[in-house]
Amino acid sequence: MKTLLINCAAALCLLLTGCDAGQAREETIPAPLTGIDHLADHLSVQEFWVNGTSGHQAGGGGSVVCCVKLPQQWHSGLTVVVGWGVTNWRDCTWESHERRVPVERYDEVGSLYVHFLSDGRVRVVSSNISPGYSNEDYAGPHDPIPSKTPYEKYGTWSPRCPVGAKPVLTESLDE
């Protein structure tokens, strides 16, 4: 009886490892995360995240958070889930977004730049070249990155805007 149990346990182990052996594990590398806000002066991306990792506030590209994981090798169909909140300082509103976004082709893993473009698109670029200062070698968008301080132009959020308001859920992967 004891031999039968040992043989059954051994067979079960072989079956379980056999199932896993056919599935190649994707090797990932940590990549610094930066958000770039290309929105109008009265709008700002106050918070964003990629695959659950917070990038905090998007700005001109100088703030870096560690880290998101990217596959060492880019492959067709590679996407990340990007979530973000947009504050409208002029109209006292804010929106919440979540979208699956393709990661643009890369040869080697670099910093992950998330571009929030003025036309509503989001582009995700992994690059070892910074997008700042009109760097022509950067593979991502070259849209203007406005220097802005909406709280100075429109005033602080409180007491001008309602406290405790819920965001308008503009888009969600759950929909």
Kindly give the residue locations of the regions a language model identified.
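Bacterial N-terminal signal peptides that target proteins for export
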Residues: 1-9
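C-terminal motif of bacterial Sec signal peptides marking the signal peptidase cleavage site
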Residues: 15-18
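Bacterial signal peptide processing site
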Residues: 20-22
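Surface-exposed coil/turn segments at beta-strand junctions on protein surfaces, enriched
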Residues: 26, 73-75, 105-107
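Short coil/turn motif common to extracellular beta-sandwich-like domains
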Residues: 26-33
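Structural motif
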Residues: 33-42
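Tryptophan-paired
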Residues: 46-91
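Beta-strand-rich cores of mature extracytoplasmic or soluble domains
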Residues: 86-175
